[in-house]
Amino acid sequence: MSLLSIFLMDEPIQIEPIRRLPHIRDLVTDVSWNYEINQHIRPLKPTPREADGTCRMQQKDIEHIQEFHKCIECFLCQNVCHVIRDQQVKEFAGPRFLIRIASLAMHPLDTLNRLKELKDVFGIGYCNITKCCTEVCTEDIAITDNAIIPLKERVAGAFYDPLAWLWRSLTSVSKLSRRGFNKIS
């Protein structure tokens, strides 16, 4: 999105529909794909309240995710994302929904582990961090730096770190119970 003041009035201005979405008519596109992706995102599951009825959070944790809530869902980031537009990878949710998942995954009260979904369902590995989504964001959200990169780091640590894999394989309760170690003799 651009301000009208940056254009010269003696040149024609080209307006076109969002390229990624199926074209219906004129500037109208079919946005149903966005709603389908959104339905796959599990909602926030907060930790239970403490005995005094409160939920304690650090202010810095709250401020970190508030940036993500500025999104107005204009889908310009989805339109400019070359993974969605050019490669048409169906397994990639796109920057808008990675922002939404980041707002949930980084919420101080969320109890769900969203890493497997990020990897398998939403295809975070397809993002090659070109920052084109950040450049077009009308709300100046640092999509790549504050959401996508931290999520990719979490996924990499959980699934591709050899030391973490070794630790999980040695301490996995499910593997131990399959071997009969959970039985009391």
Where do the language-model regions lie?
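Hydrophobic/aromatic-rich structural module bridging two neighboring secondary-structure elements via a short loop
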Residues: 1-19
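Ferredoxin-type iron-sulfur electron-transfer modules in oxidoreductases and energy-metabolism complexes
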Residues: 13-185
